Amino acid sequence: MFNKFKKLISLVFATVLLTSISNTSFAADKLHFVIGGGAGGGWDGTARGTGEALTKAGFLNSASFENMSGGGGGKALSYMINTKPSDTILVQSTPLVLRSITRHSGYVDKKNAAKVTSYKDVVPIAGVIGDYGAFVAAKNSPYNSWKDVVAAYKANPKSVKMAGGSVRGSMDHLIGALAFKEAGANPNDVVYIPYDAGGKALAGLLSGETQIISTGLGELMGARDQVRIIGITAPDRVADAPDAPTLKEQGYDVQFVNWRGFFGPPGMSNKDKKAIAKMLGDVQKTPEWEAVRARNAWVNIYNPDKKFVKFLKTQTKEMTALMKKLGVI
């Protein structure tokens, strides 16, 4: 399902690219990634994987990372808005769009609405990847498929506790709610246990605190020896995880891909924004990036600059419809 990547970018091309970027105030030899969740989560993996590819492919000399958990990504977002750090980008995904929806829908009371930040408060640089939703159970679980989970839930709704790597109303929660709704259950009755990123959610599953996890497929690729993937939200099986069954093939037509991308602080120059966006696009043509992409089963979805803004506006409408469908707003 993935396009074959192009020939390796020559060292000469990379040198020319770095030279062109160095003419901006963006320091092309380094980049700092702010991550709004804990270790082992989708944001964490996307930031570190992108930084790894950029350095190994020669686009950067160094990449540094800072996990700033809190408020479902809100703490990191506020940090970017209030401090406006240089040479720093924020990794974000669909939850940032959800913030925009909650600000304008009355989901947050009027007194606190002004405190709700969204993608409009930072500078969209580029969307880079898509990650399908995935549901997993422990290896020793009686659940071998999503149908098994649905049957257990219908027999006793409280017996199935679903973990996720963020707060209620986050993508992990919404994708899980969507899958249960497709199975004929009331999504608001599902017991959802929030954790600080996918790593802790996985620990909760393995300890028996929860029965299933709703998360991104990429977050599970490194833990496949510990868990059983019982359903993913892709339209077809994914080449990088061929043993993972889709919900669709099990009779539940739930399809969703969670985008992830990068944002700059308010006031970032247009020149810097375009330079970083170009770099994020060019690295996707390298074998270093392909190695990172394949091990995470990501989909390349490159939307730079204005295309990214257009995409965010469109998804705001789509996510508003989804949240209304699920009764969240």
Please give the residue ranges for each predicted region.
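Bacterial N-terminal signal peptides that target proteins for export
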Residues: 1-12
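Short coil/turn segments
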Residues: 38-40, 94-95, 138-143, 165-170, ...
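C-terminal lobe and pocket-closing loops
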Residues: 126, 215-285, 296, 314-317
